Amino acid sequence: MAEEKIINLSHELKNFVYPNDPESSVETKKNGKYFVSELKMGAHTGTHVDYPMHVGLTNEKFENVFGNGYCVSFENLEDFFKNCPEDLEILLIKTDFSKYWGNDAYFEKEIDIENHVKKIISLNLKAVGVDCYSIGNFSVHEKILSSKIKIIENMKNLEILENRSFKFFGFPLNIEKIDGSPINAVAFL
């Protein structure tokens, strides 16, 4: 039996956020003999999942994101749609922008996915994820989220998964009435 490999798809949480988003911080205080850390961050800090409320839609209840995944390069999306896996539930799109993570140039990189949104929606996915700060403009977010497909942004290590099937597991924080959440995402190969 082949040994499974776990690939971490989430960036370390740190104060690297989209301009004008809430900054994040960790402050550790001593409380008697114990130390207690206080976390401050926006819902879209680091690798995160967007919920429908992000674009003003009614939120569904919290749930983990898991299922059969496949990763394709943004440049190969058109060919992918012609022959995608039948059991696909999670589509990850590799842009290679994650190599700029932690650098201001990261927020200057954008993808133009507008022409692919209808095809993404037609796949009836649980989620679509990207290794860049945003999958697209407000219209792209609204179309995808209103189709009950969650969006995962700021992922890493997608080059390891390119053109491969895997099991995907994403664990957001269980917070009531929120527009998104940092997510711990992994792939099992």
Task: Please name every model-derived segment.
Residues M1-L189:
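Active-/binding-site microenvironments in catalytic and ligand-binding cores
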